[in-house]
């Protein structure tokens, strides 16, 4: 199986706009940013469900898989941007990702017996 390699273009994009991100945080404040994050997370969930519909076709949609993929990427970017503006703890997120990947991989190896 091919290993997925992750680049750093997202971090670079956030670094390039660091001053603007700080300004957005100052202007909107934590409460409004949390509301925005919740809204964008909801839109991401809807985009993922729409993408699923384009792939399995059990409940057809006129949206193409390409359009659904672009929409999913846009909503994911919106969630990441909101999280970045809120100042999420990258080290903590990285630690959690490592734990969750290990747990997910282990469950799959064990045949999802302890989900």
Question: Which residue stretches match the model-derived regions?
Answer:
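Flexible "arm" and connector segments at domain edges
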Residues: 2-76, 80-115
């Amino acid at each position: 199986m091919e290993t997925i390699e992750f680049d750093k273009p997202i971090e670079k994009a956030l670094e390039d706009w660091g001053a603007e991100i700080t300004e957005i945080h100052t202007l909107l404040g934590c409460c409004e940013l949390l509301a925005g994050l919740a809204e964008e997370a909801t839109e991401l969930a809807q985009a993922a469900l729409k993408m699923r519909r384009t792939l399995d076709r059990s409940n057809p949609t006129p949206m193409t898989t390409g359009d659904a993929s672009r929409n999913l990427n846009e909503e994911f970017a919106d969630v990441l941007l909101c999280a970045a503006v809120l100042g999420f703890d990258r080290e903590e997120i990285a630690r959690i990702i490592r734990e969750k990947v290990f747990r997910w991989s282990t469950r799959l190896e064990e045949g999802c017996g302890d989900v």
